[in-house]
């Protein structure tokens, strides 16, 4: 390997454009072993090209701004397929900024200051958010406040900003099951969580259930473009 500055000083920038074959290796991602022994999953440029079909003006589950006005918050391991696609690849492909959490202790503070337009969280993160809200607003009290129109609107606005989701156009979960009751709970706060299903082997996303749909318990949504089931 090379240190970054040694790499810059030792190698000249590539002058000509590089056009890989679709069968060339795009990246290798090592899995945690969910489906067996941990292994390096080889993804080629054809897979990457298919991923691009998931974000078009007609089909845009991440609500990406094609003019590059996107903001992402990175906290998962960078070799996690969801982090690689939803945050890294999407930002590199369509433009935007990526902000990184400083530590576990500063996660909430960092997210609150960034207010990303796209946020991906595993279900455990949303459970922690929920527990934090309920520690200050027990469910009975929360229900009462949400039943008062003016108070409800103000409370939803305050909570979304406190969570760091006030500017989020897409709020997504995946990598583990999320209970439908939890998605409904968040929807009552004005937070629509899109549920995605995928694996490292199929480049993160093969189905997705839009956040506004909460009447299909146990569903992971419809197959995405270029996905065969």
Where are these regions (language model features)?
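Conserved S/T- and glycine-rich ATP-binding loop of Class I adenylate-forming
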Residues: 25, 31-34, 72, 77, ...
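Conserved pre-ATP/AMP-binding loop-to-beta segment of ANL
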Residues: 11-30, 37, 63-71
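Conserved AMP-binding A3 loop
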Residues: 26-53
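Structural detector for helix-capping/boundary residues
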Residues: 2-5, 23, 46, 76, ...
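Conserved AMP-binding/adenylate-forming
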Residues: 119, 155-229
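Conserved AMP-binding/adenylation subdomain of ANL enzymes
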Residues: 49-74, 78-158, 167
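ANL superfamily adenylate-forming
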Residues: 1-22, 134-162
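Alpha-helix/helix-capping structural signal
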Residues: 46, 124-127, 176-177, 181
């Amino acid at each position: 390997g090379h240190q970054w500055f040694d790499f810059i000083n030792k190698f000249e920038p590539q002058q000509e454009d590089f056009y890989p074959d679709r069968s060339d290796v795009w990246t290798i991602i090592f899995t945690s072993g969910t489906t067996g022994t941990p292994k390096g999953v080889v993804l080629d440029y054809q897979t990457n090209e298919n991923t691009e079909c998931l974000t078009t003006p007609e089909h845009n589950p991440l609500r990406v701004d094609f003019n590059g006005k996107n903001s992402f918050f990175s906290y998962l391991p960078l070799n996690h397929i969801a982090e690689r696609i939803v945050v890294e690849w999407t930002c590199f492909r369509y433009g935007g900024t990526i902000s990184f959490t400083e530590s576990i202790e500063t996660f909430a503070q960092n997210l609150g200051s960034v207010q990303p337009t796209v946020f991906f969280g595993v279900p455990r993160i949303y459970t922690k958010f929920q527990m934090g809200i309920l520690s200050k607003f027990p469910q009975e009290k929360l229900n009462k406040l949400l039943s008062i129109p003016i108070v409800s609107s103000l409370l939803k606005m305050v909570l979304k900003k406190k969570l760091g989701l006030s500017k989020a156009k897409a709020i997504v979960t995946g990598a583990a099951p999320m209970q439908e009751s939890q998605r409904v709970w968040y929807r009552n706060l004005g937070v629509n969580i899109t549920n995605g299903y995928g694996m490292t082997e199929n480049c993160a996303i093969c189905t997705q259930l839009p956040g506004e749909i909460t009447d299909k318990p146990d569903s992971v949504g419809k197959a995405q473009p270029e996905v065969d089931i």
